[in-house]
Structures are given as structure tokens and as C-alpha cells.
């Protein structure tokens, strides 16, 4: 085919190009016509008033472009006024901002072309507001023009503008910090915004802004009496979500605000949470009202903080001298003083019929021991029962136990006489002269148990127990050592350090005694970071021979060291590094336990991730036992860290579910105990149904721990569903003596103190972690991790460490004369009111009672009468003051 033919059949190049151009032109025309149509439609939709506003704004923009400097000023002023009045309420995009959208970049060019002048700063103000809607947010143009504009109050432009400005300040501050650029101008601007937030129910925005700038303490001067409680509530609720040391800075700010308005009881709660003795002393010394001082003494007593208040009556309150009397008053008012026997708890007539019970002597002894524990737990603190404290000593249940069972049976007198020191000592005294060594050892341990949480100037526990530290059998010495640890937990006593340190360091001493001495020192100096105790234990770990490193009691030496750093976070780093340099199994256990305890209850996500990583690593074959123990502790540590923060606690439940499916046996046996710690005395159906499933596991170690954890979860609640599940387990395991023993212990815990007590270590509206309560729970849980060696063998008396966590969940109100004052209170489920405007209700589904009353987990009380004002939040022992004037800021 010729070229002529081709050219005749195909369009020329120019024609094709023209066709393309024509297509593009038509597309552009179509788009323009669409835009024009849209604009015409918008103009047609506008009302006359809006059209007038649009024309006025365009004229003002034109005037800014063309007018002389004199006219520019008036045009800018008019423009500013129109925008300001429209942005004061931002329910929708204000019309002036909408109409000025096409002119934003025109105004930016004008601004850039002008020399520095008052008119330029005025235009910067306008551009700052317009930038909120039109500019590229990554350029922070609202902030840029704000800093270049006039120094008028940013709040003139409305709430939405101020919030937008605050977010840009936070972003700009972060980028400048990375570049190490100065930030003084940002801080100055932030401090002009904070008062606006605080006076417009936006306390959360003010706190967040200053917290991002690392200057949370600067909020204190701006806080007023009417918003102080809301500010502090938001600050304290944020603490669990922040890393160290930001959490400490937040708490110190809340403390400063409370002190500013003389809210001393709230300030003291924050100081206790900080565990700062200097602040605690300052708060106590600042109180001039004797009633307020007494209330503060009761608050310190709950945390077992050792202090001298300089007054006998105050010291009695601080030392829990009358705690037994208060508890007996509660029991009498609730008609609970009649003692119960184990059969009342077991309700064996409701269990499925069984055969072959009691066939062996071993089983019978185990059953009697279980009954001993159940009897002590159910009647704890009531100073009466029908098995042990009987008139005819020959019929006493103590002598129905054998060998090591006698230790626990005799020590149970201490639990029955819990907090009632005088009566407890008089009843235990005769057993100190017993020829039976186990009975004598039990009496020594019982003395420690009855003295838990109660201080006495005469120091009867130390006077008696110190005589048995150096001489006598291992059983007597072990009971005396642990008894001292229980009696003086949290006392921070240097004289006890001198007594117990030689036992820790003596390499010829049995490993059991050294480890118990280290544990007792940990209990006595819990959360103090005491350098002498730490160096003593570290030195012992270095000097102990290799054979001692494999001793099962070694975990308690590691725990003793870990408890010193309870809740101290980064302050434990030096000790962790030292432990890394020490060889041996106990040092590895101590390393992980110190890490766990130092972050206990903080909810620190990074540490939870670190522990989950340890759990996920398959242990190597050559060091299997050591590594699996560390994984066991790590699984437990996840719950220990997450327990103080509800969201974190919810999240780890899913991880635990996965671990039970795919984890190593060493991890699986720790998960039920972790669930028990996470939800102690808080029977959530989701958790105890899960534990019920694990209680039938093929691995008996898992089953034992799941059964015990069911007791922890339901402790002191008398939960009917849990009681039914435990009765079913008693039938299921009727031929397995160890499992049945665990079921009985769990049943005893469920009815702890006849349903009046709790094991949950948190108190004061679940904000403060009780150091000694946590230490007691950890001691028992670590023993349960190897139940066959300890609790199910001859060391079942370790269960008495749980006494440290026992406290009555009562609300008792006292009058100004110190006498019991029954008043009406509303008790209901606590409601999270953080960040809500106004004064919302803090409880829901409430029922009116007359004090004394019991408070369940997550329940809160408020007075139903205006005749009195409580000196602190309604929990524990509260003093009521006759109402003479309205209190602006309530507890």
C-alpha cells in the first residue's frame, strides 16, 4: 500500500493533536461550567442576609488589598469583629469562615508582602483563626500566625479555636524538643490558654496540654476552689496511664492543689499513694483540728504507716489498737457473732453422695487440717469458735491434728483472735510451754498472726519471738522468724534488722531459715528501698554454695529482696543490674521478682510486654528448670502489674486465655493464680467460670491452683454461685485428698470472716495499693506455685501469710466524741465521673442503709443526711462532724 493510501486512511498528526486539544478544552469547559453551576446553585441557596454577608466580606478583603494604610486598619477591625462574633459558638462551620475560604491564600500573600506594622499583626490574628479551617495542619499555621499576632486573649475567638491552638502547641512542642529548639514562646502561650480551659469545664484539656509540655505543676496557680476537685480527680485518674516519673509529677501536682485549699485528708491520700514520708508528715502537722488529726491517724493506720503522732489517743488510732473492738461492733450490729463450724460452710448434704470417705488415716488427717483452716478463716477476728477455743482442752480440735498439722492448728488461735492482741497472747501463752514441738511452733506463729496490723508499745511479739531466733529446732526458729515478719510487716524497724540479718547471712544456717528471715525483712521493710537489707540479701546470694541455689525455699529470699522495692519503679534498676552479675538460680528469680514488684499496680504497658515476651520464649533444654521458673514468675507478674488499672486488667485476660491454650506447663500453672490476684475478692462471673473450667484440668498443679484462685476471687463475699461450684468440685475430687484439701481452703476463703472481709490490696476508692496486703498475697501465691512442696506437704502454715491482706470491708461512722454514730448512708455501684461537667452522681442503683455497713468491691457510699459532714471519703472508719456550714468541696 502506498504512503498516499495510508495518509488517506489515517488522520494527519495535526488533526489528531487538534482532536486531543478539543477534548481537553471541552473537559475544562465542562468542569468550569460545573463549578459555575455549583457556585450559582450556592448563591441561589443563600438567603438575602447571607448574600449580603458574603458581599460585605469580599468588599472588606478587597479593601485590605487596595486601600490606604488608614482604611486597612478599619477594614481589618470590621473583618475581625464579624469573625469573632461567629466563632464564639462552633455548633457548625461559621458562615464568615465559609465565605472567606477562597480568599485565605490571598490574605496570606498580602500578609507576606506587608512590612511589620500594627495592621500586619492584626491580619496575623485573622489568619490564625482562618488557618484553623483552611491551612495544612502539619504546618501549624494557626499557631504560627498566633505567635506573630497581637497579644490579645485567644479565648476571644471561642472554644474550638483555643482547642485547635492547644493541639498545635502540643505538636510543635514535640517537634521542637526533637530539634532542641527553644520553647519559651509556646509555654507562654499555653499559660494564657489554661485559665480559659479551667473556667469553661475543660479541665481535661488544660491538664493534657500542660502534661504534654512537661509543666503540669504550672496548673496549680490557676485552679480555683470550685473546680479543684474535678481537676484533681482527672489528674489522679491519669496516673495509671503514665510512665515514671510523669506519674509522680501528676500526683505531686494533685497534692499541691489539695494543700492550696486545705483539703488535708485528700492531700494525705495522695501523699500515701506517693509513699512520701516527708509529705505525709507535713500534712499531719498542718492539721490543727484534733478531729481531723484523728481521722488522718485512721487513714495512716489502714496503710500501716509507722509514725508517732505525739498524742496517746492519736497513736491508738494509728496503731489499730481498737480495730478488734470496731470489728466486733460490726459483727454485733449485723448479728454475726455466733460462731460457725466447717459443716455450715461445706453443706455436705448438698454434695453428691459419695462412698469410701475417710478410708485412710492420711486422708483423715488431711481432712482435719482442712477443717482447722476453714474454721479459722470463717471465724477470723471474732474471738470465738466451736472447735479450737473450747472450755475443755481435751476436746479441742488442735489435738485432732498430727505432726506439722499441729503447727497450723495452734496458729489458728492467732487468726481467730486477729487484732485482739491481749486475748490472743493469753490464749497462746500456755502452748509455749508444751512439750510437743509442733504445738509450740504453732503458738509462736500464732503470736505473729494475732499481732498483724496492730502496733503495741510493749512489743510483746518481739519480746517472745526473739528468744527463739537463735536456739531450738528448725521448726521453732522458722515459726518465730515468720511470726516476726507478720507481726511487724511495714513497721520499718531497725532493731529487727539487727536480729534477722545474721540469720540471712549465716551460710551454715539451713536454707529454709535464711530464706524466711530474708522474707520477714522484706515484709518489715516493704516498699522502703532499705539499702542495708538489700545489700545483706545480695551478699548472701553471692556467698551461698551452689547446692543451696536449687533449694525450693530460695524463692522466698528472692521475694524478700523484691518487696523492698515494691512500687518504686526505676529505683530498683541498680539492684536488677547487680543481680545480673550474680550467678545462680535464686539470683535469676530475684531479678524477675524485683522487676515485677517494683512496677506492681502501675499498669506499665512496656513492662507487661516485656514479661509477655519472656513467657513466649521456649525454654532451652540445658537450663530448663531455671528458665521455666522465671517464666512462671513472669506470667504472675503480668497480673501483678496490671491489677491496678481496669483497662489493662481486661486486656491481659485475653493473653492469659492464649497462654492456657499454647503455653508451657510451668506457665499454665501460674495463670489461675494470676487471675486470682487480678480479681481478689471481686467475683466476676467471667473469671470464676474460667477458673472453674481450669479446676478440672488434667494437670493437677493447674487444677490445685485454679481451685485456690476461686477462693481468692470470692474471698469474703459468700458468693452463692462460687459456693455451688466449690461444692461440685468437692464431689468431683472426693477421692483426691490434695484437691479436696484445696477445695476446703477455697470454701474457707469464700466465707472469710463470715462474709465481712476482703483480700483485695486496694483501698480508698481502689486508688491506694496496701503494701503489706500485697506482700501477704505474693507470699502465699509464690508458695502455691509449688503447692506439692509447700502447702500440700508440711509447710501449709505458710498460708497464714494471707492474714496480711485480710481487712474488714466495713464503713463505721464515729461522732465527734469518738462514739459510734449510726447514720443513714446510700450504698451503690461507683460511677466513673472523670471529665464530666457539673456535679454528677457518683453512685448508681443505691440502697439506703444505717451504718455500720459492708461495702463490696466497686461500691461506694455517700451520706443520706445533711446533718453531718464526713472528714474523708466514706470507707473504713470515718469521723462525722456536725454540719455548721456548707462545704464547697466535698471529699
Curated annotation (Swiss-Prot):
Q: Where is this region: Disordered?
A: 1-48
Query: Does the keyword Phosphoprotein feature in the UniProt annotation?
Result: yes
For this protein, the record's SUPFAM superfamilies field holds: ARM repeat
Tell me which GO cellular component terms the UniProt record holds.
ascospore-type prospore nucleus; cytosol; nuclear periphery; nucleus; proteasome complex; proteasome regulatory particle; proteasome regulatory particle, base subcomplex; proteasome storage granule
What Gene Ontology molecular-function terms does this entry list? enzyme regulator activity
> Which of UniProt's keywords are assigned here?
Phosphoprotein, Proteasome, Repeat
PC repeats mapped onto the chain: 408-441, 442-478, 479-513, 517-550, 673-704, 705-739
Q: Which GO terms describe its biological process?
A: proteasomal protein catabolic process; proteasome-mediated ubiquitin-dependent protein catabolic process; regulation of protein catabolic process
Q: Where is the composition biased (Low complexity)?
A: 1-12
Q: Where is the composition biased (Basic and acidic residues)?
A: 17-30
Family matches, as InterPro entries: 26S_Psome_Rpn1 (IPR016643), ARM-like (IPR011989), ARM-type_fold (IPR016024), Proteasome/cyclosome_rpt (IPR002015), RPN1_C (IPR041433), RPN1_N (IPR040892)
Q: Where are the transmembrane segments?
A: none
In the record, Phosphoserine modifications are located at 10
Listed Pfam families: PC_rep (PF01851), RPN1_C (PF18051), RPN1_RPN2_N (PF17781)
Q: What does this protein do?
A: Acts as a regulatory subunit of the 26 proteasome which is involved in the ATP-dependent degradation of ubiquitinated proteins.
Q: How does it assemble?
A: Component of the 26S proteasome. Interacts with ubp6.
For this entry, the protein name equals 26S proteasome regulatory subunit rpn1
Amino acid at each position: 500500500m502506498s504512503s498516499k493510501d495510508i495518509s488517506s486512511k489515517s488522520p494527519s498528526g495535526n488533526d489528531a493533536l487538534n482532536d486531543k486539544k478539543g477534548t481537553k478544552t471541552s473537559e475544562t469547559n465542562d468542569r468550569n461550567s460545573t463549578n459555575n453551576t455549583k457556585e450559582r446553585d450556592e448563591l441561589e441557596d443563600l438567603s438575602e442576609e447571607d448574600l449580603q454577608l458574603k458581599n460585605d466580606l469580599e468588599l472588606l478583603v478587597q479593601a485590605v488589598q487596595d486601600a490606604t494604610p488608614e482604611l486597612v486598619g478599619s477594614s481589618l477591625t470590621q473583618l475581625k469583629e464579624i469573625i469573632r462574633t461567629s466563632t464564639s459558638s462552633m455548633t457548625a462551620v461559621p458562615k464568615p469562615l465559609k465565605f472567606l475560604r477562597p480568599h485565605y491564600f490571598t490574605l496570606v500573600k498580602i500578609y507576606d508582602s506587608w512590612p511589620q506594622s500594627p495592621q500586619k499583626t492584626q491580619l496575623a490574628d485573622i489568619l490564625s483563626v482562618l488557618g484553623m479551617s483552611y491551612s495544612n495542619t502539619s504546618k501549624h499555621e494557626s499557631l504560627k500566625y498566633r505567635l506573630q499576632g497581637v497579644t490579645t486573649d485567644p479565648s476571644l475567638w471561642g472554644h474550638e479555636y483555643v482547642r485547635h491552638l492547644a493541639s498545635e502547641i502540643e505538636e510543635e512542642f514535640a517537634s521542637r524538643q526533637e530539634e532542641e529548639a527553644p520553647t519559651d514562646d509556646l509555654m507562654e502561650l499555653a499559660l494564657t490558654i489554661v485559665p480559659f480551659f479551667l473556667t469553661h469545664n475543660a479541665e481535661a484539656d488544660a491538664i493534657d496540654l500542660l502534661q504534654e509540655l512537661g509543666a503540669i505543676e504550672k496548673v496549680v496557680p490557676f485552679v480555683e476552689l470550685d473546680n479543684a476537685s474535678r481537676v484533681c480527680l482527672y489528674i489522679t485518674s491519669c496516673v495509671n496511664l503514665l510512665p515514671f516519673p510523669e506519674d509522680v509529677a501528676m500526683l505531686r501536682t494533685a497534692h499541691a492543689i489539695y494543700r492550696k485549699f486545705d483539703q488535708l485528708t485528700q492531700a494525705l491520700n495522695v501523699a500515701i499513694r506517693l509513699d512520701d514520708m516527708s509529705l505525709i508528715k507535713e500534712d499531719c502537722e498542718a492539721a490543727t483540728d484534733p478531729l481531723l488529726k484523728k481521722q488522718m491517724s485512721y487513714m495512716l493506720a489502714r496503710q500501716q504507716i509507722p509514725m508517732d503522732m505525739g498524742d496517746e489517743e492519736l497513736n491508738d488510732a494509728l496503731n489499730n489498737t481498737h480495730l478488734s473492738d470496731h470489728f466486733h461492733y460490726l459483727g454485733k450490729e449485723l448479728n454475726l457473732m455466733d460462731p460457725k463450724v466447717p459443716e455450715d460452710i461445706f453443706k455436705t448434704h448438698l454434695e453428691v453422695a459419695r462412698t469410701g470417705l475417710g478410708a485412710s488415716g492420711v486422708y483423715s488427717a488431711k481432712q482435719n487440717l482442712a477443717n482447722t483452716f476453714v474454721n479459722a478463716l470463717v471465724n477470723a477476728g471474732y474471738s470465738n469458735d466451736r472447735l479450737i477455743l473450747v472450755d475443755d482442752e481435751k476436746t479441742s480440735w488442735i489435738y485432732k491434728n498430727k505432726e506439722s498439722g499441729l503447727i497450723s492448728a495452734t496458729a489458728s488461735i492467732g487468726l481467730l483472735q486477729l487484732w485482739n492482741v491481749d486475748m490472743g497472747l493469753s490464749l497462746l501463752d500456755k502452748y509455749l510451754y508444751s512439750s510437743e514441738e509442733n504445738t509450740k511452733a504453732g503458738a509462736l506463729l500464732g503470736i505473729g498472726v494475732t499481732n498483724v496490723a496492730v502496733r503495741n508499745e510493749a512489743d510483746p511479739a518481739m519480746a517472745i519471738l526473739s528468744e527463739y531466733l537463735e536456739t531450738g529446732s528448725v521448726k521453732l526458729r522458722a515459726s518465730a522468724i515468720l511470726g516476726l515478719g507478720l507481726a511487724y510487716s511495714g513497721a520499718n524497724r531497725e532493731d529487727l534488722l539487727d536480729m534477722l540479718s545474721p540469720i540471712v547471712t549465716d551460710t551454715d544456717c539451713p536454707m529454709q531459715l535464711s530464706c524466711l528471715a530474708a522474707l520477714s525483712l522484706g515484709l518489715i521493710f516493704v516498699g522502703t528501698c532499705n539499702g542495708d537489707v538489700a545489700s545483706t540479701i545480695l551478699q548472701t546470694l553471692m556467698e551461698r554454695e551452689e547446692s543451696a541455689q536449687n533449694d525450693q525455699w530460695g524463692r522466698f529470699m528472692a521475694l524478700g529482696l523484691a518487696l523492698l522495692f515494691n512500687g518504686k519503679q526505676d529505683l530498683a534498676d541498680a539492684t536488677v543490674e547487680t543481680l545480673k552479675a550474680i550467678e545462680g538460680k535464686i539470683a535469676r528469680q530475684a531479678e524477675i521478682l524485683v522487676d515485677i514488684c517494683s512496677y506492681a499496680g502501675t499498669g506499665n504497658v512496656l513492662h507487661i510486654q516485656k514479661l509477655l515476651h519472656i513467657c513466649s520464649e521456649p525454654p532451652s533444654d540445658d537450663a530448663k528448670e531455671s528458665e521455666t521458673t522465671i517464666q512462671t514468675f513472669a506470667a504472675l507478674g503480668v497480673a501483678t502489674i496490671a491489677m491496678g488499672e481496669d483497662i489493662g486488667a481486661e486486656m491481659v485476660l485475653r493473653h492469659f486465655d492464649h497462654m492456657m491454650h499454647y503455653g508451657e506447663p510451668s506457665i499454665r500453672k501460674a495463670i489461675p493464680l494470676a487471675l486470682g490476684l487480678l480479681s481478689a475478692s471481686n467475683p466476676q462471673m467471667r473469671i470464676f467460670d474460667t477458673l472453674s473450667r481450669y479446676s478440672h484440668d488434667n494437670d493437677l498443679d493447674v487444677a490445685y491452683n485454679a481451685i485456690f484462685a476461686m477462693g481468692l476471687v470470692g474471698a469474703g463475699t459468700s458468693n452463692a454461685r462460687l459456693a455451688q461450684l466449690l461444692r461440685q468440685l468437692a464431689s468431683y475430687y472426693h477421692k483426691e485428698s490434695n484437691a479436696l484439701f484445696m477445695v476446703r481452703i477455697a470454701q474457707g476463703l469464700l466465707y472469710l470472716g463470715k462474709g465481712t472481709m476482703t483480700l483485695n490490696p486496694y483501698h480508698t476508692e481502689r486508688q491506694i495499693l496496701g503494701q503489706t496486703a500485697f506482700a501477704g498475697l505474693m507470699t502465699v501465691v509464690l508458695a502455691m506455685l509449688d503447692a506439692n512442696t509447700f502447702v500440700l506437704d508440711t509447710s501449709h502454715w505458710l498460708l497464714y501469710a494471707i492474714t496480711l491482706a485480710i481487712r474488714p470491708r466495713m464503713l463505721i461512722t464515729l461522732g465527734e466524741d469518738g462514739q459510734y454514730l449510726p447514720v443513714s448512708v446510700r450504698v451503690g455501684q461507683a460511677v466513673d465521673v472523670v471529665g464530666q461537667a457539673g456535679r454528677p452522681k457518683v453512685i448508681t442503683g443505691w440502697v439506703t442503709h444505717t451504718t455500720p455497713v459492708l461495702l463490696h468491691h466497686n461500691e461506694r457510699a455517700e451520706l443520706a443526711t445533711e446533718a453531718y459532714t464526713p472528714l474523708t471519703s466514706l470507707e473504713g472508719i470515718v469521723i462525722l462532724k456536725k454540719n455548721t456550714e456548707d462545704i464547697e468541696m466535698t471529699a
